[in-house]
Amino acid sequence: MKKTFTGVVVSDKADKTVSVKVERRFMHPLYGKVVTRSKKYAAHDEQNEYRIGDRVEIIAVRPISKTKTWKVTRLIERPRGIETTAVETEGGNA
């Protein structure tokens, strides 16, 4: 069974790669407080189809590059009302 995580895409700038932030919550062993920790994983995105804010599932695969050993398997949720176009992302020459 391969490891799978669920996280949010925080960067899609690189070609065929997205950065996925995975958060985990646990009870502190001494103080009993619920603590949140996060880690970013570089995940393979062959078609460049995932955007910032998408909730995705990633799975461990063989090493694709030096830092990339995860692959996006499916889109879980896409935020509503966030559609970017090429004109908006380039910025104008105001």
From Swiss-Prot:
Query: One GO term of the cellular component aspect?
Result: cytosolic small ribosomal subunit
A Pfam family recorded for this sequence:
Ribosomal_S17
Record-linked InterPro entries: NA-bd_OB-fold, Ribosomal_uS17, Ribosomal_uS17_bact/chlr
- Key word Ribonucleoprotein present: yes
Q: Which residues form a coiled coil?
A: none
> Has UniProt tagged this entry with the keyword Membrane?
no
Query: Which Gene Ontology terms describe the biological processes this protein takes part in?
Result: translation
GO terms, molecular function: rRNA binding; structural constituent of ribosome
Task: Report the sequence similarity comment from the record.
Answer: Belongs to the universal ribosomal protein uS17 family.
Q: How does it assemble?
A: Part of the 30S ribosomal subunit.
Summary of the function given for this chain in its UniProt record: One of the primary rRNA binding proteins, it binds specifically to the 5'-end of 16S ribosomal RNA.
Write down what this protein is called.
Small ribosomal subunit protein uS17
Taxonomy, top ranks, is:
Bacteria, Thermotogati, Deinococcota, Deinococci, Deinococcales
Q: Which gene encodes it?
A: rpsQ
